[in-house]
């Protein structure tokens, strides 16, 4: 029997279906996502929750003429399935396949790329104003999760809507979750709207009465009646005060009602906000039971939802376990996260120290300034934020923390290549954007045990500290029961050598070990150095080896521009030393999504490439090369 989904290659095909057929199509799409993502992983829960909403939008509006701007856009899988990418859906988040986020390069239906939260409303407003200025008629719809409303950028845009356009539709997709349960006053406010029994009762009664009225204007009357009752109960609805007409909340899984609502809203000449209630993980019991886990995950059993376990602890888990130890040692230690307790593993810290744990929502700037404020009163804030998200707080890092020399510890999870999530999530710029800032100490551990030592050392340091560590599991080394202090600004010489000095940053020490072995097999004695701290840098160790070897190799999981290798070149220049330098790192481009090993091979972040480049110089020291020369 042919599936309805088999007939959908574009939104035009979707419009050929009867409204009554869309429920069956929704079921087929859910099953397709459950099956495909069980093999490759992805953001399953959020996408299961927006099936009906996405179908209704495409049924009423006309993309690519009209524009759907998804906040974060990790919930755009259904959109991709019905906009010509169905036959490539099995490649999602795989190298060479379609992205797990909206991508302007991928499809004309993706009007705006994203990956971080809070951008949709600003972008949609910009599109709407551009449309107005050229006299266009297309619709612009911003799809924002409720978590996006904990992000200050969203409210900056809301503050600007009424004064700049009269035609904009904002959809608030309310499932009470981002990656973790939403927090703060905004989340409580949404819940108050949804659960107000008087409002729900009156709304339902009015609808039942009006359903019996004849005439074409009944829908308009119904809407006005609903708004009248709402205004009685909610005289100061925040969105109304900001100039958007509020509609809802409505059931985000009722396709017929969604379609009728969109048909009504598309004809209105005022900015509107539609509050839609959806269920994250709908249609897959394991995803409903464990919404946090199924927000985004790797391969899983499509029947039970079980995922394979790793025998090794992740760096995030070691971070959380160490934080618990530090909190036991020092009552002034506090932990701060920006809506990522699960991703940073601070959900393990929270039950033990609930009064010393703070989830501030998707608000990285606020998180950093909040930490700075606590630091002025003697507390030791550890601010755990993904490397890619800390970019959003660059000004507070400089202005509020480093300028005042406050002892805030930035714990940069996902430092380095992130993998399947792609360019919006790789943490490849942090060394470059942090090492230019005065007063900050930057550390990068080679393994799990050294991470624990660095966290402990940071507790005793009187100024700002950034500790960068990667996603996923480490090498499996044992972590000491009690961490130890490490000397800030002093490198660890793992192995001495006469011909080559390999400076490997962080987890790239493992690659450095392999390179040293390969060079030894080729007859060259190689030293291996673990820098430990990028800032302050151990210039003395660099000078010692620069005066005694024929080649320096730097290896980093970071862009070359402004990164660790650049630092080595700068230091050699300052020392007045000339020596060939081979730099291994990421090129000056945004790195696509894919498995880490595949991407490293493609871009030459391999032992083989490092060996080849090194031997070119060692065998022909006087020849011209394209390698970096200090």
Curated annotation (Swiss-Prot):
SMART domains per UniProt: Transket_pyr
Enzyme nomenclature, EC number: 2.2.1.7
Reactions catalysed according to its record: D-glyceraldehyde 3-phosphate + pyruvate + H(+) = 1-deoxy-D-xylulose 5-phosphate + CO2
BP term (GO), one: terpenoid biosynthetic process
Transmembrane segments: none
One term under GO cellular component: cytosol
Key words, A-Z: Isoprene biosynthesis, Magnesium, Metal-binding, Thiamine biosynthesis, Thiamine pyrophosphate, Transferase
Keyword Metal-binding: yes
Enzyme class: transferase
PANTHER family: 1-D-DEOXYXYLULOSE 5-PHOSPHATE SYNTHASE-RELATED, 1-DEOXY-D-XYLULOSE-5-PHOSPHATE SYNTHASE, CHLOROPLASTIC
Quaternary structure, from the entry: Homodimer.
Role: Catalyzes the acyloin condensation reaction between C atoms 2 and 3 of pyruvate and glyceraldehyde 3-phosphate to yield 1-deoxy-D-xylulose-5-phosphate (DXP).
Name the UniProt record assigns to this protein: 1-deoxy-D-xylulose-5-phosphate synthase
Species the sequence originates in: Methylacidiphilum infernorum (isolate V4) (Methylokorus infernorum (strain V4))
Lineage: Bacteria, Pseudomonadati, Verrucomicrobiota, Methylacidiphilae, Methylacidiphilales
